[in-house]
Amino acid sequence: AGSEEYFMNLLADAMEPLLLANGIQFVRNDPQGTVGNSIRQSNADSYDFHLALHSNASGSGSEGQNRGIIVFYYPGSVSGQRAAELFASALREIYPLPDRVTTRSAENLTELRRTKAPAVLLELGYHDNAADAMWVQEHIGLIAQTLVQALTEYFGLPYVCPGPSQTGLAVTDSGGPVNLRSYPSAQGQVIVQIPNGSTVTVFGRYRGWYVVLYGDALGYANSAFIQL
């Protein structure tokens, strides 16, 4: 047994290596903080997306009687609605009652109303329903993978299965820098140039590209210029 907070943090823990392997940088909220703290943290920088992980609770008198997943977005947010529909579509593939995975707009949820970035709030089943609670507990890894796959689709990235992280060196024959790009393509935007001989961390591979962390910059580098 455990609290909603406990299992949602386990889920976030499981998502971390998948996000890194897919070139998606992230910041997590303080588990001890309030919703207000999470909103302020989200608005303190120029983030591309805000994802809130929750489980639902039935109203008084109907505890344990409800099941289902609700994906909330703020009304009028085109990006938020698009993300919500991607999450819902992916979750229908793994939730035992796919017809009970729905999207819904909501004006009254502060994590949607007050965040600057497009936002989605996930209610992953009802924690007062034994079957829903057990489904979450027994499928943390699968749920994490499903959510990250939806995020890669949202960001237009290929999904990469994570391997063990490895230390590598950025090396070019010319001695010039290695471009770290936002997408695994020579047309991808250059995020930063990695000086020749620099140490990097490699989290995954997609075709001829490695997912690389250099300093605090995460992106894709041509595997020809990374020695493991």
What are the residue ranges of the model-derived segments?
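Catalytic-core regions of hydrolytic enzymes
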Residues: A1-V78
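Short alpha-helix capping/helix-loop boundary micro-motifs
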Residues: P31, P184-Q189
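Active-site-adjacent substrate-binding region
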Residues: V78-T103
